Amino acid sequence: MSKMVMLLSSDGESFQVEEAVAVQSQTIAHMIEDDCVANGVPIANVTGVILSKVIEYCKKHVVSDSPTEESKDELKKWDAEFMKALEQSSTLFDVMLAANYLNIKDLLDLGCQTVADMITGKKPDEIRALLGIENDFTPEEEEEIRKENQWAFE
């Protein structure tokens, strides 16, 4: 039987996961190495809803001893569907913040690539709307920036 680790979200939810799942987070892996998990691992900046998504990703990505090309392709397909679901449920950025906080590089990279794909080919106004960023430049300041960076608009 594999060793279990208790993860405690910021809003008080607890999740019992296998150590192989938990150690995909470098942050948690270091806590396990330092023997700091006896009373559970508090994940201060991550709610239960988001932590459950992170755990779902980590469970799917527990490395098998001999992954086949077929299993790699299936995982890529699963990743794409997972990211699409996060995007549609408006939890993508929260999951990315959690991945960064927990140091889960592959999940953070996947999230960053998803955001890059989302903004590719979009105009600044569209990107601001998509990411919820307020434009705090005056029209004059925008024009000045366009002139200074003309090469980027060619």
From Swiss-Prot:
SMART domains: Skp1. GO terms for cellular component: nucleus; SCF ubiquitin ligase complex. The keyword Nucleus applies. InterPro entries: SKP1, SKP1-like, SKP1-like_dim_sf, SKP1/BTB/POZ_sf, Skp1_comp_dimer, Skp1_comp_POZ. Mostly expressed in inflorescences, and, to a lower extent, in seedlings and siliques. Also detected in cotyledons, leaves, pollen and seeds. Residues 96-154 are annotated as: Interaction with the F-box domain of F-box proteins. It is found in: Nucleus. Keywords: Nucleus, Ubl conjugation pathway. The keyword Nucleus applies. It comes from the Eukaryota. One of its GO terms (biological process) is auxin-activated signaling pathway. Pathway: Protein modification; protein ubiquitination. Involved in ubiquitination and subsequent proteasomal degradation of target proteins. Together with CUL1, RBX1 and a F-box protein, it forms a SCF E3 ubiquitin ligase complex. The functional specificity of this complex depends on the type of F-box protein. In the SCF complex, it serves as an adapter that links the F-box protein to CUL1. Belongs to the SKP1 family. Part of a SCF (SKP1-cullin-F-box) protein ligase complex. Interacts with ADO3/FKF1, EBF1, PP2A13, SKIP15, SKIP16, CPR1/CPR30, At1g55000, At3g61590, At1g67340, At1g78100, At3g04660, At4g38940, At4g39550 and At5g49610. This is SKP1-like protein 13. It comes from Arabidopsis thaliana. The lineage of its organism: Eukaryota, Viridiplantae, Streptophyta, Embryophyta, Tracheophyta.
